[in-house]
UniProtKB/Swiss-Prot annotation:
One of its GO terms (biological process) is manganese ion export across plasma membrane. Keywords: Cell membrane, Ion transport, Manganese, Membrane, Transmembrane, Transmembrane helix, Transport. The chain crosses the membrane at residues 4-24, 40-60, 64-84, 108-128, 134-154, 165-185. It is a multi-pass membrane protein. This is Putative manganese efflux pump MntP. It holds the Pfam family Mntp. It comes from the Bacteria. Its main location: membrane. Signal peptide: none annotated. It is found in: Cell membrane. One of its GO terms (molecular function) is manganese ion transmembrane transporter activity. It comes from Bacillus subtilis (strain 168).
Amino acid sequence: MSDLFIGELITLSIMAFALGMDAFSVGLGMGMVKLRKKQIFYIGFIIGLFHVIMPLAGMAAGNMLSGLLGVLAVYIGGALLFVLGVQMLMASFKQSEERFMSPAGPGLLLFAIGVSLDSFSVGLSLGIYGSHPLLTITLFGLFSMMLTWLGLLVGKQVQSWLGTYSEALGGIILIVFGLKLLLPI
């Protein structure tokens, strides 16, 4: 394996972790409700699936934009990651109403779309940047699925304060990667 591939693997793993923290934090809240193990498995699987579909769609759009915009596209991608990270960080400190939705049927579908929308934006940025699609969606799907499961399971045991901090950590990580693309460091 080349150093470039290993670097991309590490970078994408950290990004996948950051995006999965959103699903983890919401999973913590959902986990406070009594769920059976089968429901926990199904919820994590659906969240992981949407964290594959959304960045893939974003990467396809990003690849098209990259061809049209050239070098400027990298800066646009960095700006998108930065803004997404700031939004995620700010949202973590807002006192919001109960974010819980029914963990089945349409409620689960809306939940999965909601927590994977940021993956579309990141996928757009990575498509502009020219990232490996298969590696990206595999990591995003696995990380989000496992972190959702972890959030649901830990949610049964832990108070809700951890959810705010995990979402803030995810936002900070995205800000750092956005700055990395924006600033030639």
